[in-house]
Amino acid sequence: MTVTIVGLGLIGGSAARDLARTGLASVQIGVESDPDHLRTALQLGLIDRELALAEAVTAADLIILAIPVDAILRILPDVLDRITDRQTVVDMGSTK
């Protein structure tokens, strides 16, 4: 299963770590605006690669949104326009 994680901070990074440990995801794709979070996730092996949001959503079986709720509301229409009935979107949004 290919998993895209949008947001690699505390929540998204923890989800990526646990998915990597269990082997449930064959490929993990990260979408992250903070270059330090992205670099750390790649160095720790939490994600296999980074893609832009549109590409990452299209490539995934499971999309995890782990960003603040206001940011989810901004990107959700684009995400939902790109998914098929074979993909799942999970909201792990946090308020800040």
Q: Predicted regions span which residues?
A:
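Rossmann-fold NAD(P)-binding glycine/threonine-rich loop
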Residues: 92-96
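Rossmann-like NAD(P)-binding element
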Residues: 53-90
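NAD(P)+-binding Rossmann beta1-loop-alpha1 motif at the extreme N-terminus of oxidoreductases
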Residues: 1-58
